[in-house]
């Protein structure tokens, strides 16, 4: 027993010295209840994807990769995340490496263009330096880099068209992510990288698909989200959108490999009510009797949503209070935390620091 007390005393002194040298919080006991906090998130803008993430959205203080084929909805998902961050009172930035952002489309998705920070960098080094500076500022909540494939190293831009530039982009990403990863965690920002799929040549077994930018992003990303375009959504003979299939291929904050299906309407983004309706029917929250749909409120009142799915979806669009109640019930069922506004989150953080 005396030996154990001596060990404990020596350990306490060592921890105290570390905190004096490197600051409070540089080392801690994992089981200490004051240190273990629930994962804070920024919603994805899609209820189905929020459920698939297991925590209700993109985890704060982490790096996220959204990758997929062309026109699969990667930028749309990133813009929806920006809109959600702004709704919470947060600051968002869009690093437009592709120089292809459509402000009209972004506005239709709910993005506040007046408060959105945007940069169209000349080369990859500049883009990643801007990301690093924004993260270190500690006041930006969400940074989107669109896309990794467009982060062209300066040497490649300045070189001749036919010059061999082996592994430049991979080295650039590896060096940048080593710097960014630590400061992202401290700032509680979310950094989303969109990425494109390429085909590996000469692959006989396994998937020939890979993403650009080397392996560093795969390692540093807390969450990797694969996006694939599904069947078209039609209104009569006209194609008005696409079903989007999402798979969480890597997740460090919840069980991975969950899937989600969402619906993107051209020019408008995610059809939230259609998505909500389908989830509610699958979960038994909305009942189907023949071709009619009914919902029983928390007060016990049975409400007719209409005949056929299109009428039921329109009813939810016309009655946001009913739609909100259904969404809350679904989130409670999956144990997803209610999202706080940014001001409330910062107040809690500051009051916690004062108490400590």
UniProtKB/Swiss-Prot annotation:
* GO process annotations (BP): DNA recombination; DNA repair; SOS response
Q: Name one GO cellular component term.
A: cytosol
What the entry lists under PROSITE patterns is as follows: RECA_1, RECA_2, RECA_3
| Keyword flag DNA repair | yes
Which subcellular locations apply to this protein?
Cytoplasm
User: Which keywords label this protein?
Assistant: ATP-binding, Cytoplasm, DNA damage, DNA recombination, DNA repair, DNA-binding, Nucleotide-binding, SOS response
Per the record's keyword annotation, is DNA repair included, yes or no? yes
Check the record and name the HAMAP family matching this protein.
Answer: RecA
Record's protein name: Protein RecA
Q: Which organism encodes this protein? A: Thermotoga sp. (strain RQ2)
